[in-house]
């Protein structure tokens, strides 16, 4: 019985600390130091939320750039069901999916030069990637330019403006934020 009181006191103390004080402190500090990130890194346009800087969206019209395919459950780009397809590289189902995506992209981008960039036909581990490489964006540029009736040079300028450099200049690779790029295209010509 003598051990019960300290054990219960410790239980109550740690419950209050880890279940109340710590979450409250991290929320307050997060809102204070990292307001944008704590609120989901949202992109707003005319006081309307268009999406998150960190979560991909489906774009299917020819006038928009397309991101990586989504492998999330239930619906594409579902942030509540993040995850890959878990198909092994040796799985014939993955090969069929990739071939179907290659054929669809080739049909939608008949003027594209070179091979279809691999990230446009394979889903990421999260299934929610927001960005593509500049090469994948430039590969789609002829289609977008033609659909919008603007020059490839203008589309290329927008791609370069919406390319984020690697962290510290050398960690990772340049990434084009597909949502921001498509919004820039709409601002140029809706």
UniProtKB/Swiss-Prot annotation:
One of its GO terms (molecular function) is ATP binding. The keyword Membrane applies. The chain crosses the membrane at residues 10-30. GO terms for cellular component: plasma membrane. It is a single-pass membrane protein. Its main location: membrane. Part of the high-affinity ATP-driven potassium transport (or Kdp) system, which catalyzes the hydrolysis of ATP coupled with the electrogenic transport of potassium into the cytoplasm. This subunit acts as a catalytic chaperone that increases the ATP-binding affinity of the ATP-hydrolyzing subunit KdpB by the formation of a transient KdpB/KdpC/ATP ternary complex. Belongs to the KdpC family. This is Potassium-transporting ATPase KdpC subunit. It comes from Cronobacter sakazakii (strain ATCC BAA-894). The lineage of its organism: Bacteria, Pseudomonadati, Pseudomonadota, Gammaproteobacteria, Enterobacterales. The gene is kdpC.
